[in-house]
Amino acid sequence: MFKSLHQYAHVFSRLSLFGLAFAAAAQAQSQSLTVISFGGATKAAQEQAYFKPFERSGGGQVVAGEYNGEMAKVKAMVDVGKVSWDVVEVESPELLRGCDEGLFERLDPARFGDPAQFVPGTFSECGVATYVWSMVMAYDSTKLARAPQSWADFWNVREFPGKRGLRKGAKYTLEVALLADGVKAEDLYKVLATPEGVSRAFAKLDQLKPNIQWWEAGAQPPQWLAAGDVVMSAAYNGRIAAAQKEGVKLAIVWPGSLYDPEYWAVVKGTPNKALAEKFIAFASQPQTQKVFSEQIPYGPVHKGTLALLPKTVQEALPTAPANLEGARAVDAEFWVDHGEELEQRFNAWAAR
């Protein structure tokens, strides 16, 4: 009798443990995390590398959304205390500005791995870098008699007739205008920090203005190039690579490109901060970053990832040594300090 009761107790104990484990797993699966990124080919790669694997690992459901980087939407949520986004993908100037304005949670780098295993600049007070991208010059190789070599060629409508695509904003657009005007990449922000440099950039844009078609979403440049609406465009390298995979005959000019990390940030006041940090840690592993870079050629930030990637993939990354020749890192601090005034001036100029 005692043996029988002992057996029942043992079975009951095991069933209880199983029930607790099942309940914990069910609770994890019932948790959802809203992750907002820039959409398009990048979001598709994130789905394969991060969102779906995170769900399969039991981390919780990922509700994926997209935006065009409008910090006003984040600010509105934080200001009224109704935060519906948990994790957002942001560019470095917006990360620094948003951190200063209290829009993002402070993050502890120790939660995401050994900092020595990541490229410099991965960890910020309010963000963790997820990949490195480049703003490049792209063109349709079937529509030009010869290949353009520089932003000076981009401005040369006599030898390269046709419309040009440029991002509708001061950031990146003022930089390429100065590069087209002969400013060296290493002197770019030193010149742009002066009133004379700013006037020089806008004067250069005046020359091209009748031939410019402005884009606001990253998907537009490859679409316009493929349709023949423009013959050259500033574009995100990953968007051009996605079009190339589909058989569109687009080419990239790497010298004069502008590269920058993209970051994950956690929106201030989210009730899911712990889950958000868990997701970011998951997305910061070499294996998950490998899958991402195989889907879209953006540079990984974990140093251990490169050894896992085929050579052909490594050569297409913005961080490949050959692609960094003549390239310039975006100066995020410059845009934090001068962004508002330059965007206002740009908007007034574009409206004329």
From Swiss-Prot:
One of its GO terms (cellular component) is outer membrane-bounded periplasmic space. One of its GO terms (biological process) is thiamine transport. Its main location: periplasm. Residues 1-28 form the signal peptide. Disulfide bonds: none annotated. Keywords: Periplasm, Signal, Transport. It is found in: Periplasm. The keyword Lipoprotein does not apply. The keyword Signal applies. This is Gamma-aminobutyric acid-binding protein. It comes from Pseudomonas aeruginosa (strain ATCC 15692 / DSM 22644 / CIP 104116 / JCM 14847 / LMG 12228 / 1C / PRS 101 / PAO1).
